[in-house]
Amino acid sequence: KHDLGRHCLLARRLLESGVSFVQLSHSNYDTHNENFNFHIEQLAEFDFAFSTFVADLAQRGMLESTLIVVLSEFGRTPNVNLYQGRDHWSRAWSVCLAGTRMPRGHVFGATNDKGTEVIDKQVDHGNLFHTYLQSVGVDSTANFNIDGRDMPIADPASRPIDGLLV
């Protein structure tokens, strides 16, 4: 019914054919005005397509070998602006992980009551990257060689998210 649903179906077919990485996009969440009216439609489309995609992979036995990551480059302000929108907010936002080695129905970390600050288990992009790699069986502490020079696969100062992978 929607482009995202068709793209999820194509992604599943690509994964079935052996493609190892697929990226989907669902854009236009940058709602500085009319946030609520727009998101009623936008989130309904995402919710149906995403939940169907996850169920589809699980039904085919592919979820245990597929990592699904849903994220944005920043969050939205906890408060509504003058135009009934939400602006950019970099201090706290959510990431959804599903599939290989990810616990089902698990909430990791917390924000304060206003959603403005992380108060428990704050992580950064380095932690996420290590976690992604480890979840698909790549040793995130290993190196790879570029023209005779060893380079770390991931930031050596970072590590996977403690207690997340099962």
Language-model-detected regions and their locations in the chain:
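Ligand-binding pockets and gating/stacking loops
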Residues: 1-166
